[in-house]
């Protein structure tokens, strides 16, 4: 008799458990809401603002959120690379600089920033190439800065002739 009662209790418990599993979502269908395409841009701007104020923890949160919202956004990769560069996390910085220029080779600001990073890492020739890539964009407003950076980096090779060439180009 007890065996029969315990079987009924077990069956009842399993039934209740299964019913609970099927109604856990409240019976409502789950809808996917696509993120606002501008949200990633806004989070990049917020991240840069927090970074300028030295609040790196919140900056990282905002930039990671931007990358979750749009993993293909070059400005998000560039911004988080700058943050990792400041934090001394060179491997992560390089990864995101590469992603940024890969996703938009004409993104001159990222090319220039990547060049600065490479020059700091003593990869002078590669850095100079990034600076020159930055100057190829006719709409880039900081060509003189990129050429000055190329001259500074060429000076560290050391190639005084090449450095002088870039410095003179920067002045024109």
Where are each of the predicted segments found?
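Bacterial Sec signal peptide processing site at the extreme N-terminus
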Residues: 18-38
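Structural marker of alpha-solenoid helical repeat scaffolds
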Residues: 35, 69, 103, 137-139, ...
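Residue-level recognition of tetratricopeptide repeat
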Residues: 39, 46, 73, 107, ...
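Canonical tetratricopeptide repeat
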Residues: 45, 79, 113, 147-149
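Register position in tetratricopeptide repeats
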Residues: 52, 86-87, 120-121, 156-157
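Canonical positions in the second alpha-helix
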Residues: 65-66, 99-100, 133-137, 169-170
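TPR alpha-solenoid repeat register
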Residues: 76, 110, 117, 144-146
């Amino acid at each position: 008799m007890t065996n029969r009662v315990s079987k009924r209790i077990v069956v009842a418990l399993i039934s209740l458990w299964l019913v609970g599993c099927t109604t856990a979502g409240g019976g409502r269908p789950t809808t996917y809401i696509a993120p606002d395409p501008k949200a990633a841009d806004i989070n990049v701007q917020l991240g840069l603002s927090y970074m300028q104020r030295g609040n790196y923890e919140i900056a990282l949160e905002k930039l990671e959120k931007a990358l979750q919202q749009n993993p293909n956004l070059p400005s998000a990769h560039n911004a988080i690379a700058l943050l990792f560069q400041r934090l001394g996390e060179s491997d992560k910085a390089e990864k995101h600089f590469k992603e940024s220029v890969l996703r938009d080779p004409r993104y001159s600001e990222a090319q220039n920033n990547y060049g600065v990073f490479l020059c700091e890492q003593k990869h002078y020739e590669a850095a100079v190439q990034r600076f020159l890539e930055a100057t190829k964009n006719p709409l880039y407003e900081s060509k003189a800065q990129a050429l000055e950076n190329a001259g500074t980096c060429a000076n560290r090779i050391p190639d005084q002739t090449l450095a002088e060439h870039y410095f003179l180009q920067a002045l024109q």
